[in-house]
Amino acid sequence: MYLKEGCSLLLKVQKPLIPFVLNTNLNVNHLLTESPNHAEIKELDVVKRLRQESCVPLALHFFKSIANSNLFKHTPLTFEVMIRKLAMDGQVDSVQYLLQQMKLQGFHCSEDLFISVISVYRQVGLAERAVEMFYRIKEFGCDPSVKIYNHVLDTLLGENRIQMIYMVYRDMKRDGFEPNVFTYNVLLKALCKNNKVDGAKKLLVEMSNKGCCPDAVSYTTVISSMCEVGLVKEGRELAERFEPVVSVYNALINGLCKEHDYKGAFELMREMVEKGISPNVISYSTLINVLCNSGQIELAFSFLTQMLKRGCHPNIYTLSSLVKGCFLRGTTFDALDLWNQMIRGFGLQPNVVAYNTLVQGFCSHGNIVKAVSVFSHMEEIGCSPNIRTYGSLINGFAKRGSLDGAVYIWNKMLTSGCCPNVVVYTNMVEALCRHSKFKEAESLIEIMSKENCAPSVPTFNAFIKGLCDAGRLDWAEKVFRQMEQQHRCPPNIVTYNELLDGLAKANRIEEAYGLTREIFMRGVEWSSSTYNTLLHGSCNAGLPGIALQLVGKMMVDGKSPDEITMNMIILAYCKQGKAERAAQMLDLVSCGRRKWRPDVISYTNVIWGLCRSNCREDGVILLERMISAGIVPSIATWSVLINCFILDDIVRAHDQFTI
């Protein structure tokens, strides 16, 4: 969907088909051996010319020309060289054609050449064609071997064709071929890729029983998979059965980090060093990445220092993690300075992942100009932006409120041939909703389904939020019903919260509480936002008693109140005329050990409640306490007190006049 101010519909452009052989009239006489007697052209000369020619179409033209000249008859070797060249270029049909020519001329295909043919099918993602070719192997005068079977299995693994892997493996055993460690490793990867960890562990035992000793790849594959599904402890037990290697340690460190067991990961790193196993760049980068993600940037830099002391140079992923950590800490300047130092100091070549870290970082800090500058630089140096690059920029423009910018990046993305995914579609829906272009947003969601990119719950949440914020509640409720009925997308608590917020803001509090019954019937767990939204709505609707009942339910449900909840409780007490109780709540929060403290809203609400209860002196005392606590009064705070004193003076004047 190309977008402009009117948001026109998507125009999909099919890529032109390129013929596999270029039919040219190029003069390739200079490639022929300049011999006075062309009949003396030798196999060695032809092979040399074919290998030296970097242009595949020219090499193929030479191959055909020399055959048509009757000066040379191609041999198995010249066929093999040409087929390998075409295979490396991914020209499947040309490879197939020359194989057929070899067969017609009675030449046998060697094992290595057949493996090259299988490899070209893998390269272009045609695993089934590779299997079909394999089962015709004898037509080309080549016998199956363990090596060929292994390459077929590996090709199938590349496309995760697990059923076909089992079928080919069964035929391999039927034909009397004993699997080797490479065969088993392919099978282990297939099992682990499909979360069949128990099967992989059994296969390890089978390997040993058959005298095929598992290698580092075997154990690393299984232990990595175990860590992925949370079986880190079991993975460590398995690792203790054999000589440890760095790749296994890396898998375990990664598993411990995913479980947030950083202490265990550090201890494992120490154990590696004690056993004489040097941590590599993956070991350090894994730890640095999790430390940066958790905001422990200083500790991450200490690991970088340790890494450099041990002579282990960082790679581009180490750099990306550290730059991301700087952005998360809010130090944009440090992030850019670190980037420049490491690029120059270590000669690192940034890739799209590294550039995306910069783009995302700048966008998250609202510096869209810098983000676009990085994007332009990527295009200039030939580093193609990917879907994450475009998604970050669209989201950055959307958050900044620039629909034109988001549309510009959207159209650049489509022009480049990069198809949007559900996240980018959702970002664009959000951008359109921010500018009240709800028809266009609805149209985009319809297009998603047609493009086989089903809208997700967050997509509908963005649309519903936009509608609710604009007061289009009836439309929002219609979308809410459609998302499940038409798109089979059940709402989550965020969806309900957006609707509750819309209803509460429209003072339709009864409908909001009616919606909570549906939430209960569906068994959807309430979040803190659910309670806070209803608390706010109840207070604004003049129902402080119901708001306080909600707090009781919140406690029973085991939800911890946050600063928003406490401010709502204080407001509810004040609206009930219980300002003293609200002040006690303020004292309780101030003395507690919670992570948060009363803010300007908390104090202002209590001051308002005290003034409302004719306790203006207490309000002034609370103001002084607020200032001494380092909290700056807002305009609302001063307005409450000024209005209180003005009203009191008016009342006094009225009383004196009446007397």
UniProtKB/Swiss-Prot annotation:
One of its GO terms (cellular component) is mitochondrion. Keywords: Repeat. PPR repeats lie at residues 75-109, 110-144, 145-179, 180-214, 215-243, 245-279, 280-314, 315-350, 351-385, 386-420, 421-455, 456-490, 492-526, 527-561, 562-598, 599-633. One of its GO terms (biological process) is RNA splicing. Belongs to the PPR family. P subfamily. This is Pentatricopeptide repeat-containing protein At3g48810. It comes from Arabidopsis thaliana (Mouse-ear cress).
